[in-house]
Amino acid sequence: MAISAALVKELRERTGAGMMDCKKALEETNGDIELAIDNMRKSGAAKAAKKAGNIAAEGTILIKQGAGFTALLEVNCQTDFVAKDSNFLAFANQVLEVAAAGKVSVEDLKAQFEEARVALVAKIGENINVRRVEYIDGENVAAYRHGDRIGVVVTGTADEETLKHLAMHVAASKPEYVNPEDVPAEVVAKEREVQVEIAINEGKPKEIAEKMVEGRMKKFTGEVSLTGQPFIMEPKKTVGEFLKEKGATVANFIRLEVGEGIEKKEEDFAAEVAKQIAASQKA
């Protein structure tokens, strides 16, 4: 049976799959569109399983305020092109709505949206992953998104404009803790050990190296804490000094960046093209 363009168009509209996939599905079912849809749903699950091994390190960070808390969500895909796709963003926003409705765990979000995720993988041809969700308590908050890749929420006693500026600072400067004294003892001890070793390797006697490290450790805890960092909008002041002038405090913050901690697989362009050609010849 000859498959008409109109039938292919209808199947594309109903499934969102590619033209060649639709044509192939209709040929396999002799033009039975309902059976083709069933088969594509089944093969879509298989396709999603194949894509699951692909590294998803692109994506988006979304933020939404709930009742007394704010949710930050990361959803990943494989390419920055898909990260801007309307279907991908619609899926991510659906997950966000549920997360912000009641502090739903990432495990429960994954389970609830698995069927929709599988369908989306089949539709766009990339692995999709609901990677993480974090929540920060407080009503007095400011949120900042730098493009789609970085999301920050800061809570404290400051006014909205001040908190927004602090959120922008966190996005740019990547502090790990609020105050220098919040840096865990084990982190300080590990850094001290490294700095002593560096000083000894520079030729300093151990007892002198130990004394030198005290200054370096103060610098280290300042660099990794929000209040110890130079404020990006007034670099001559630390964030702590800026807050003191404002009579304000920061209670907590969360910063998420797309793909942080995910090891990307690097392939050169020629190798990627060769891989695609080989795959098409096997099909």
UniProtKB/Swiss-Prot annotation:
GO terms for cellular component: cytoplasm. PANTHER family: ELONGATION FACTOR TS, ELONGATION FACTOR TS, MITOCHONDRIAL. It is found in: Cytoplasm. InterPro entries: EF-Ts_dimer_sf (IPR036402), Transl_elong_EFTs/EF1B (IPR001816), Transl_elong_EFTs/EF1B_dimer (IPR014039), Transl_elong_Ts_CS (IPR018101), UBA-like_sf (IPR009060). Associates with the EF-Tu.GDP complex and induces the exchange of GDP to GTP. It remains bound to the aminoacyl-tRNA.EF-Tu.GTP complex up to the GTP hydrolysis stage on the ribosome. The keyword Cytoplasm applies. NCBIfam families: tsf. One of its GO terms (molecular function) is translation elongation factor activity. SUPFAM superfamilies: Elongation factor Ts (EF-Ts), dimerisation domain, UBA-like. Keywords: Cytoplasm, Elongation factor, Protein biosynthesis. Belongs to the EF-Ts family. This is Elongation factor Ts. Residues 79-82 are annotated as: Involved in Mg(2+) ion dislocation from EF-Tu. It comes from Shewanella amazonensis (strain ATCC BAA-1098 / SB2B).
